[in-house]
Each structure stands twice: as C-alpha cells, then as structure tokens.
C-alpha cells in the first residue's frame, strides 16, 4: 500500500512538470484550463465571532467572509427577534382596543347618568324657584296683613286717645260752666274733678303708642330669588377643543345651566340696582333710606305720632283723609301720606291726632267791669321720628323717639266805653315762647265754634239740657263759645310753600320738651247788665295787630336772626328774588357756621342715576340729625348761588381719613344748563373741579363751566353719554376728575373690570384725593354766602 501511494505521488509531480514544459500550454490556458475557482475553506469557530466584517470581494472570500451557515443563523436570529416584537405590539394593540371599547361604553353610561341627573337637577331648580317665589309671595301677603293690622291698631290708638281727650275736655268744661255760675250752679250741683286719673291714662297710652308695630328695615323688604339660564356655559378658549371632542362630550353643552341671584331691594348686594341699566327703568323708584342706627319704619308710615316729612311745594293744614302733595285742606286729622292707603300697600298711616287737653276759663269771685278769658290749649307731639326734610317724591323716614311742643299765646283785649259814646276796641296780640310764628290770626279768632261749647254739652247729655237752658240763658253768647280747636302738626310740616307760614325750629339735640298753647282773651265791659240791648247798635272799631318775622334767606341768615339758629337742624328759608319757601338742613358748627347742605352720600341707600327732572326738583331725605342721602335740586342751587357762594366739599374714605375742598361757587339757570362756575380753590382734598386730573389732561377733566348732564339729557364734551356710563348726574367734561353722584361701592377700592357693562371707574370718586378706582365712604356738599354779602 505504501508503494502505491509513493507511485501516485511521483506520477502527479511528473504530470505537472510535463504540462508546464509543453509547447501547447498557451492553448490550454486559453481554453480555461489554468483558472481556479474559489475554494471553500472552513474557518475556525473563533473567527465567526467577529461582527465587523467588511465588504467581501472574490479575493477575500476564503480568509475573511463567514460561511453561509453562519449567515443563515444570524438572519434567523434577527427574524425571530422581529417576530417577537411584532407579536408583542399586536397583543398590546388588541388590549388597547378592548380597553378603549370598555372605556367608551363606560363613558356613554356615565354621560347618560349625568344627563339624567342634570335633567332632574334642572327640574329641582325650577321647582325650587316656584316654591321660593310662592313662599315669598305668601310672606309678602302676611307682611302686608301685619302692616294693615298695625295701622288698624294705630287707628284704634288714635280713637282711644281722641276719646280720652274728649272725656277730659268734657270734665273740664263741666267744671268751668259750674264755676262760672257764681253761686246758683254751685248750690245746685256739688261736684269735684280729678285730672290725675286722666294723666295716668295719658301716660299709659303714650307708652302703648311708643311701641314699634311696623317691621324693621331688615324685614321690611324680602329678597327676591331670580333664576336665569347661563348664556355662555363653555368659555371661549375651550370652544375650539369641544369641536374635536367625542359626540358624547358635546352632549354636556345641551344641558341647561341656571344661575341663581338673590336681589335685595335698596341695598348693594346680589343686584345693586344702581347701575345704568337698572336705574333707567326705575329712575324714580322708592328706596327706604335713613341714617345709621335709626329704627326701621315703613317708608310712608312714620309711625304712631310721627312727625312726618317736609315736602317742598306742599301747603295745607290738616285735612281729613289723605294728605296729597300740593293740596290744601281744612282742619282735621286722619291719614297722612302720599296716596290713599290700602291693605299692605305700605302707604298712608293712621296717626293719632295732636292732643288738645281742654279749655277752661277763670273768673274772679267779684264782678268787675272788665272780664278776662283764658283759652289754654296744649299741643304735644310725640313722634317716632325726629324732624325730617324730604326732597322730591322719595318715601323715606328716620325714627328716633322725641317729644316736641309748640307754645303760642293769643291775647285779645276788648274795651267798651260809656253809654253815650259807646264803642268797642279790640286789640289782638299773638306771641310765642320761642319767637316762632303762630300761624294766621284768624285761626284762634273768637268767632270760631269750639268743640267744648254748652250746646255740644247739652247735646251729649240731653237729660241735663233743661239745667243748662235755665241757668245759662242769660249768659252772653260770647261766653258760650268755649272749647278748643284741634290743630294738627301736619300743617306745620307741610305749609312751607306759603310765605306766611313758618316752620318752627327745634333743637336737634333736645329729646323732650314741655309745651303749652295759651290763648288769653280779656273783655272789659262798662255796663254788663244792659250790654245786650246796647250792643246791637254800637259802632265797632277793631284794630288787629300781628308780629310777623321776616323769612330767612339762607342758613347764615338763620344763624344771625333766629334764637335757635345756632344749632344744627332743619329750617325754612326764602332766597332773595324767590317767592318759594322751602326747608333745608343747616350746619352751624363747621368753620364759621351758616353752611347749607345741598348733597350727601353716606350709605349707598339711594340711587343717584336719575332723570333731568329729578335733579331739577331734588330727591332724597334727611332727618333732623342730618342723616340720609339726598340732592337738594338744581333750581334751588341756582336761587341760592345767584349772589355768589362758597362751596365746601367734605370727603371721607373707608379708613376714616377726611379731607375738604372749598371753591367760589355759582350754578346757572336751567336755560344755561345749570352751568357750573367754580374758582379760588383751597383745601386738603386736591383741586378736582378746576384743575381736574393732571394725568388725563385738564382740558378733558376740568368741571369748570361745564353744563349739568343726566342720562336722558347729554350736555358733556364726550362723544358718548358720560352720565349713563358713570352712573349719575354731574357737570361732566370728557368725562370726570370728580363725581360725587356716582355709584356707591362699599369697601373703597373696586375693580372697574367688574362693572358691567361699561367696565369703567364709575364710583363716588375725587381723583386727587384717593384715585379713580376708590369709592369714598361719605361725601357732603355745603354752601354759604361769600363773606361781606
């Protein structure tokens, strides 16, 4: 075997050498005999672990490139990895689809559930609104019934009081008549009078009348619950996103949403009511206003024995029934209000008549040529509200217990001379303790028929008529006209239009004072026995005198001329060149005194966004302490400033800081648009009327020489209506650096962006003092004549 292998090896070598050395080797090579193909070379296992293989060429295939089995293994491994990933993604996709389907189903179920809940809630809201409105209506009916019963109780109190007065007067009249008989009656009738029992009854009745029967202010007006649909449920920034939302989410917009608002009439709250939109529809609305700390009362019912209102332009003495503005009436008592009373209407009030505690005469024990008669009539006014000043047609009252009295004395001296030249001289003098006017001289004339006459006494007691006829037949008819005349205090409070009338001044600090009204008549007769026969043909010469005070021009004149003028209070004035007498509040304590209050804001209870006519006539009310909100009236401002005046503006912020500004001041006539003329500023608040706002520009914000503007009569320099935007009548330019008639915002600083619909600084502002976005707590405007006038 070994030899065979050696032989094969030798043959192979020989064959190779022979082939190389042959001459035909070119033909062999040309036929491809010398070409070698690639040889498969198995690499070591360690060489296949390399991962960075370059591109393989034919020359590099054997010693660098991996084998096909290795490549297939790598390909299979990568394919398996990708397959696993794809399967994992498919499983996740299936899970997400299943979860999405479940979530959609759950969302639809939730939306259906919420839709049902919203529908039920909407029904509940509607039911709640109806029930609350029905409850409010029933409470309102109950409140009106309570007020009606209170008025009936007051009427009964008035009747009881009048009956007590009549009983006491009857007792006094009987006693007077018995004592006037001078012997004959005293022998026939032995009688004693006890007035202490009546005084005790009077005190008890006064205590009963003093009790407050009407609801308090916080219970006087029930808040109203208003429900309205929300217009924009989805904010504008989310509306675009809602378009891309699923249909079930869009169903939320179809659900109706309601807004509930609690409105309190006459208060700043859920609905303030003094915005331009609200006030224009109710520019003459009635608001219950009174000073802080005062007891609440019905706006048109001052309460039992209340002193009532002073209405500029009204005159008349106490008339039976209702007392209407601008009407006059005869003596009487009864309801006193702006309209006829009706159950629950809160207008009208049965007020007890002013007491007149009787009439008596005193005669001496011996006869004399001259006879003296005294008529004593005392008038006591017990009120549940101090003296008040009412401007315009507002129905406002302020309470506080006070008793005021008025004392007047009328003396008549009658002299009759001898029989041959008999004549009668009558001298009449009317005086009062406080120097006030006592009214017309004819009010207490002897020719009036008095309620305490003998005729009336005989009518009340017919069983004693024979006694009076027998014993008093010879008495002069003049002696029969005893009694008293009921004189209601309403003629004092409403007769301010007549120049002859005078409103007595009461000290605002006094709470109780004693009063009596005396009428003294003296007759001197020369021949009493034959007076009836000779009196028919006598010639009568009557001289009647009456002392009348000159009407005061303003508060400074009140300070100089009236005894009670040094105290703050309400007084009656008559400006020069005017035939109108009206009532004003005088401040006699500030600076030199003599200040006349023309405007005041203190609690935001009164709406100042009024019409031109309202600002012309004035509106609002004040009590005798100067508490309340009001505007005196542009007509009165023009009359009071014709001769030049000083304007004082007093400001107070919510921290208690005070400031003032004073100007030379004049207001033009209505034909001039009530143009404002101001100059000569001095003070601590800053010059807002002449200089205006420096930042906004004086030419745009100065109020000097500007006409008065209201929302229904635009006279400003702006292309729009400043009064409508800023919420009150004022002397606007384009538009303001001060506005004391703006909207009252409690708390001071306010955000104008919340002031719908104008989003502007429309508060009670004085820009140099606290800025345009700060609404002041209290402001007052006062005037007085220039020094030297």
UniProtKB/Swiss-Prot annotation:
Domain Fibrinogen C-terminal per the UniProt entry, residue ranges: 546-787
Where, by residue number, does Ca(2+) bind? Answer: 714, 716, 718, 720
**InterPro entries reported for this sequence:** FIB_ANG-like (IPR037579), Fibrinogen-like_C (IPR036056), Fibrinogen_a/b/g_C_1 (IPR014716), Fibrinogen_a/b/g_C_dom (IPR002181), Fibrinogen_a/b/g_coil_dom (IPR012290), Fibrinogen_aC (IPR021996), Fibrinogen_CS (IPR020837)
Q: From which organism does this entry originate?
A: Mus musculus
Q: Does the keyword Chaperone apply?
A: no
- Site entry (Cleavage), positions: 36-37, 101-102, 122-125
Post-translational modification (record): Conversion of fibrinogen to fibrin is triggered by thrombin, which cleaves fibrinopeptides A and B from alpha and beta chains, and thus exposes the N-terminal polymerization sites responsible for the formation of the soft clot. The soft clot is converted into the hard clot by factor XIIIA which catalyzes the epsilon-(gamma-glutamyl)lysine cross-linking between gamma chains (stronger) and between alpha chains (weaker) of different monomers. Forms F13A-mediated cross-links between a glutamine and the epsilon-amino group of a lysine residue, forming fibronectin-fibrinogen heteropolymers.
Can you name this protein? Fibrinogen alpha chain
Q: Which portions of this protein are annotated as coiled-coil regions? A: 69-554
Q: How does it assemble?
A: Heterohexamer; disulfide linked. Contains 2 sets of 3 non-identical chains (alpha, beta and gamma). The 2 heterotrimers are in head to head conformation with the N-termini in a small central domain.
Signal peptide coordinates: 1-19
**Biological role:** Cleaved by the protease thrombin to yield monomers which, together with fibrinogen beta (FGB) and fibrinogen gamma (FGG), polymerize to form an insoluble fibrin matrix. Fibrin has a major function in hemostasis as one of the primary components of blood clots. In addition, functions during the early stages of wound repair to stabilize the lesion and guide cell migration during re-epithelialization. Was originally thought to be essential for platelet aggregation, based on in vitro studies using anticoagulated blood.
> Bias regions of kind Polar residues — which residues?
397-416
